[in-house]
């Protein structure tokens, strides 16, 4: 008696087809849990200058200042996308202004754009002072982004605590004046 090879192949193939139908795609990572308004308030609070602290302020371009004021007004009205557009226009005029980059990072947080917020904050760190209130705001922005990530990055120097240590290192007392 001879057996056909088809049944021997058909049963494992059928079993594989059934198992494949049971598989599912991995679940999407959870959406970031971020209260943008609260995060921006915490960032701005971290940038408050003490009277005993060194705080350097650059000379401002009046056209850029007008756009920054427009963005501030739009943000207050809850029109975050329009505020971002005004800040982007200002950045076209002055792409290296660390304060402007920080304001753009904060605007990105308001629309829950974590990658954009971190990118603009890092640009501000690269192009700005490594001390003072603005430096603290850059690092607090990065801390807020890291805190809001659904899955924290497991790499040395990439934790919320690391960002907060960097933020605290930005505070330097002003030189004594005699």
Region locations from a protein language model:
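Terminal, low-structured helical/coil segments at or just beyond the last alpha-helical repeat
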Residues: 30, 139-178
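Sec-dependent bacterial lipoprotein signal peptides
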Residues: 1-22
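Bacterial Sec signal peptide processing site at the extreme N-terminus
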Residues: 16-41
